[in-house]
Amino acid sequence: MASVEPIKTFEIRQKGPVETKAERKSIRDLNEEELDKLIEAWRWIQDPARTGEDSFFYLAGLHGEPFRGAGYNNSHWWGGYCHHGNILFPTWHRAYLMAVEKALRKACPDVSLPYWDESDDETAKKGIPLIFTQKEYKGKPNPLYSYTFSERIVDRLAKFPDADYSKPQGYKTCRYPYSGLCGQDDIAIAQQHNNFLDANFNQEQITGLLNSNVTSWLNLGQFTDIEGKQVKADTRWKIRQCLLTEEYTVFSNTTSAQRWNDEQFHPLESGGKETEAKATSLAVPLESPHNDMHLAIGGVQIPGFNVDQYAGANGDMGENDTASFDPIFYFHHCFIDYLFWTWQTMHKKTDASQITILPEYPGTNSVDSQGPTPGISGNTWLTLDTPLDPFRENGDKVTSNKLLTLKDLPYTYKAPTSGTGSVFNDVPRLNYPLSPPILRVSGINRASIAGSFALAISQTDHTGKAQVKGIESVLSRWHVQGCANCQTHLSTTAFVPLFELNEDDAKRKHANNELAVHLHTRGNPGGQRVRNVTVGTMR
């Protein structure tokens, strides 16, 4: 069984002479030689005989499971090192990618970690690049398709609340529409689910289901707004909109963005006179489209919308506990880091001295969202000087401030040269006006929900049929119910733009009960109606 001891000095840069900067490209732009080297490097780190910080098992295990520290067998704490729902989300994952890229470059010194451009037209139309969905590459197992566990993981928190994320040695990571639950109370149902898929669909059809799921999330609700303009909404819209969020604290995570939007939100009172204050845009954090893509690949059931046709899908990307064991995780996060890099460039914040946080704001405390990570006490204020454990640089603890000056990083990004529609070739303009009516959904307590979940917003059309118009996803951990350290920080509030409606129509439809919100969880995939819904604007 894997050790629970932390890796105390995990260096994120190569020692010795100044290294050549890695140039991170779109994976669709790699030539055959570059792709060959990438595959060979991934095979090298996934070699079951490899141990220590160059082993994929240990690299993947830094994010979530196998848990360590207080979170090893105590659900009051988070046993993974990763940060979500706080200001360290972008920088911790930046350090994490550097650690993985360092290991890959030991296998092949000129290899770089590519990004999967989730914003381009090719992804919106066809889904995941083929290199991630083909079982073999040139006659050998493809290391980007799946990972086979070299050791077992035991979920010591399995009895609380109701899910077991233990994984046996030899387990192969899976994606939607498969289920990867292996606990003693789940494995029979998961095997029945997976056997049904294998008996009724071939590999091409299974890949088609996954790609359909991904494209549905990206393309949901492509509207003609009240000004006659085409608006690409939901995940693809969020990817662009997050770059316009100016304040780092708000941009960095969902917890801070929820509070910021709450402060700007003004209800549209039926029959009342609306405020004359200048309209402002809804703040979309970087973490929001990130969450959507995790759930798109992992699977969450939302009836009536082409997001999940098969109840019971539990792909590894769908929960923080095991997401990092799926190789696609790193290409997804490389895209998220490129968005972060682009945001820094757009807002002229390419040096650490140019970025500050809102002190003691929601999203700046260790108990926000997931709970304290190993080495950080409960109710600790987070800053840009908070150590990003377990990462080190020349023996010194890595902090956010050490990773915010772009010219000092050991890598650069190259914009995509093939395809169309990429956000990196068509960066949105700052001060872009966007002020549709906003649906505010509140009263969601994550303490009672095991795992990730989604809120689906539907609108009754002229035939009386409900049509799903928006989804807000929450990437979570299985055992959040037991997090006594973060019980008062588990309230989720969502803000969803209603692009098709003007303010009067939004008020009327809300008053006539034509706008509905349902909460879809693992335990209740059919959805539960949420009543705490308000229509308003951002002022």
UniProtKB/Swiss-Prot annotation:
Taxonomy of the source species: Eukaryota, Fungi, Dikarya, Ascomycota, Pezizomycotina
GO molecular function: metal ion binding; tyrosinase activity
Modification(s) after translation: The N-terminus is blocked.
Source species: Aspergillus oryzae (strain ATCC 42149 / RIB 40)
Signal sequence coordinates: none
Catalytic activity: 2 L-dopa + O2 = 2 L-dopaquinone + 2 H2O; L-tyrosine + O2 = L-dopaquinone + H2O
Keyword Oxidoreductase: yes
Name this polypeptide is given: Tyrosinase
Subunit details: Homotetramer.
Residues that bind Cu cation A: 63, 84, 93
Similarity field: Belongs to the tyrosinase family.
InterPro entries, per the entry: Di-copper_centre_dom_sf (IPR008922), Monophenol_mOase_fun (IPR016216), Tyrosinase/Hemocyanin (IPR050316), Tyrosinase_Cu-bd (IPR002227)
